[in-house]
């Protein structure tokens, strides 16, 4: 089980990312567009730099939805490898079977 403070911090980061997502997308589009004047591009870069660090989506960590484990995460299920195995063996994941070859 991950520390509750780490899980809470990650949740706050997700909220911050959601709050700034549209403006960040607009600014990055202005910066990437080749037809943008240099002064406008610099202003967009400065505004992007002034935003909080936690507004970047890369700062959010994928965590297990059951216990918050940060490593061994499977996106398709939202679970870590440990909980994925336990729930698959218990039959809680429809369509998941143990492989044999």
Swiss-Prot record:
Alphabetical list of InterPro entries matching this protein: Ribosomal_uS14, Ribosomal_uS14_bac/plastid
Keywords: Ribonucleoprotein, Ribosomal protein, RNA-binding, rRNA-binding
Domain of life: Bacteria
Record-level Gene Ontology MF annotations: rRNA binding; structural constituent of ribosome
Region (Disordered): 1-20, 28-72
Subunit structure, as described in the record: Part of the 30S ribosomal subunit. Contacts proteins S3 and S10.
Name of the protein in question: Small ribosomal subunit protein uS14A
Source organism (scientific name): Streptomyces avermitilis (strain ATCC 31267 / DSM 46492 / JCM 5070 / NBRC 14893 / NCIMB 12804 / NRRL 8165 / MA-4680)
Chain's gene name: rpsN
């Amino acid at each position: 089980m991950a520390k509750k403070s780490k899980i809470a911090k990650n949740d706050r980061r997700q909220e911050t990312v959601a709050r700034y997502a549209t403006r960040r997308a607009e600014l990055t589009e202005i910066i990437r567009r080749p037809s943008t004047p240099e002064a406008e591009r610099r202003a967009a870069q400065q505004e992007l730099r002034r935003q909080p660090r936690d507004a970047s989506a890369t700062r959010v960590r994928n965590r297990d939805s059951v216990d918050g484990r940060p490593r061994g995460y499977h996106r398709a299920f939202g679970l870590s490898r440990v909980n994925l195995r336990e729930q698959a063996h218990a039959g809680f994941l429809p369509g998941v079977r143990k492989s044999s070859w």
